[in-house]
């Protein structure tokens, strides 16, 4: 496959990471880090607990209804699957909506909308004393924002940087969040061990995740670079 003329013209010595923090690219790097870190941290912090939460919510129902151990186990397996499906379905719809919204509203307003939706959905889903069935269904609403925002990264990050550093910049900004999220399995294990079979510990933990997209929404008007209608940087 022939490389594009633009890429060939910009190829040569590989750029150093420091170039991302040069005066000409500093604002773009800051915007990319903000949206990437917010999306990755918000998604991981919720998604990591979704199957466990489904199982523990089922346990709450089983105890309330006095189900036999075999029936309780079947219910837990079904709710684990339903919790993941609800979250992922919301993410799919949210991802499909991001592109037309970004075209209509612009990139910055779209990110702000997704971040505010995510914060509100997390607060409502994990902060209110909801019945287990309602809390399970609300994972769909959480997925719309927390998971759906990822599709906006696909077109936004390349729009920020010139060809010669586009791959370096996108990879660096996106993978910073992945490095931080690598500590996630240890946190999940520790919190699950202290849950004691109740969903309360999980909900009281995850509700604090709302601070991540809320802070990003407050920073977005100054930090997120609007790229709608702009040509890709050379």
Show which residues each predicted segment covers.
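Flexible cytoplasmic inter-helical loops of multi-pass small-molecule transporters
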Residues: 1-18, 230-234
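Extracytoplasmic gate region of multi-pass secondary transporters
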Residues: 26-92, 181-185
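Interfacial helix-cap and linker-helix signal at transmembrane-aqueous boundaries
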Residues: 54-55, 101-102, 188-197
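Helix-to-loop junctions at the C-terminal end of transmembrane segments
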Residues: 94-106
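Cytoplasmic membrane-interface "Motif A"-like loop-to-helix N-cap segments
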Residues: 104-115
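Multi-pass alpha-helical transporter architecture, strongest
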Residues: 128, 210-234
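A membrane-interface helix-boundary motif in multi-pass transporters
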Residues: 193-211
